[in-house]
């Protein structure tokens, strides 16, 4: 476990033992922004798991506030009632999984909302940047990439894809070590086995 060499939690070995074989025997398949947020949360706390959990929960709440702010702005552009945004926030899955269980899909959704916001403002470069950041948080937004391309047309799609490609390539620079890329790829391949 790489983090155990950098950060010393008193019960890190006990936690590692409780992870289960799938997590113990494979490297993380989370993209760089996800890794960075969780790593920084561990780094800034006082080596207390409780403090780390509270810190991560506060970070996720800040991203949720960003979803609220830009979600309302996006709904205004779309000429939809702004109270629709509360369908997202009152969804039990969002409440339990994102804030309760500390999943970083809320960070991904924040960047996706910003991407859509800029898409509807006809700023495809900014839209590409934020979709790239969303992909660097979780890989799920790759699924909706074709929807953007249909809306943008060929010329703007090329700029959009180039923006995302440069951003994602830059985001993976810390993984340039060939062995790290192999470990990441092997973990991603678990999804398809």
Which ranges hold each PLM region?
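Primarily membrane-embedded glycan-assembly and transfer machineries that use lipid-linked glycans
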Residues: 1-101, 107-113, 152-193
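Residue-level recognition of short, well-ordered coil/turn positions
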Residues: 123-124, 154
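Membrane-interface alpha helices of multi-pass inner-membrane proteins
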Residues: 95-98, 114-118, 124-149
């Amino acid at each position: 476990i790489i983090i155990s060499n950098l950060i010393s939690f008193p019960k890190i070995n006990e936690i590692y033992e409780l992870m289960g074989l799938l997590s113990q025997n494979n490297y993380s398949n989370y993209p760089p922004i996800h890794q960075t947020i969780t790593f920084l949360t561990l780094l800034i706390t006082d080596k207390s798991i409780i403090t780390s959990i509270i810190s991560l929960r506060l970070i996720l709440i800040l991203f949720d506030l960003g979803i609220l702010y830009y979600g309302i702005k996006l709904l205004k552009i779309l000429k939809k009632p702004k109270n629709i945004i509360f369908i997202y926030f009152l969804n039990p899955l969002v409440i339990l999984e994102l804030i309760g269980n500390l999943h970083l899909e809320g960070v991904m959704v924040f960047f996706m909302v910003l991407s859509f916001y800029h898409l509807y403002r006809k700023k495809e470069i900014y839209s590409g940047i934020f979709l790239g950041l969303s992909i660097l948080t979780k890989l799920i937004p790759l699924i909706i990439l074709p929807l953007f391309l249909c809306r943008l047309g060929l010329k703007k799609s090329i700029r959009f894809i180039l923006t995302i490609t440069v951003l994602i390539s830059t985001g993976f620079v810390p993984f340039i070590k060939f062995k790290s890329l192999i470990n990441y790829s092997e973990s991603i391949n678990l999804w398809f086995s």
